Design a protein with these regions (language model features):
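Terminus-proximal functional modules
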Residues: 1-156
Length: 156
């Protein structure tokens, strides 16, 4: 079976869906909506699904939720700016950012707890006005790798 492994969207409403074979997923469900679909996500959590991909196209949100994701718990941080305090609180509780997406006025971060705790995982976030190529290369040298990228407005 093929399952959605990544999605992306553009300001003009265009989208890209990547489907992969051989993933660990057992079942998927997706939703496209004009506002962030909190109620739908909560309903799917109760059914054993977890957010595994997320994107925006213009002002619309696309969320993919899967069974068999390897997560034991998940939470959402949704904010008009960057929800620094919420993210740090979740990091301290063992959650890691597993998906990000933003519209012009909102940014969403999915933080998940893996079923099997990784030995020692560290995360950092960076907000920039241009892609941080040099910064990324410096972090690669310290064994930090890109987990998620999203495009949104930056606030100075």
């Amino acid at each position: 079976n093929y399952y959605i492994s990544a999605i992306a969207g553009a300001n003009n409403g265009s989208s890209l869906v990547v489907m992969s074979k051989g993933t660990q997923y057992l079942q998927q469900s997706y939703k496209v909506s004009e506002s962030f679909p909190f109620k739908w996500i909560n309903k799917k959590w109760r059914e054993g699904f977890y957010v595994t991909a997320m994107a925006t196209a213009g002002s619309r949100w696309a969320i993919v939720m899967s069974r068999g994701s390897g997560f034991s718990d998940q939470t959402v941080e949704l904010d008009f700016l960057y929800p620094s305090e919420g993210i740090h609180k979740r990091w301290d509780a063992g959650y890691r950012i597993t998906a990000t997406a933003a519209t012009w006025d909102q940014a969403a971060f999915i933080l998940s707890k893996p079923r099997r705790k990784p030995p020692d995982e560290t995360q950092e976030t960076l907000r920039t006005s241009a892609f941080p190529s040099t910064h990324v290369k410096e972090k690669w040298a310290k064994n930090l790798y890109i987990a998620s990228v999203c495009y949104g407005r930056t606030v100075s």
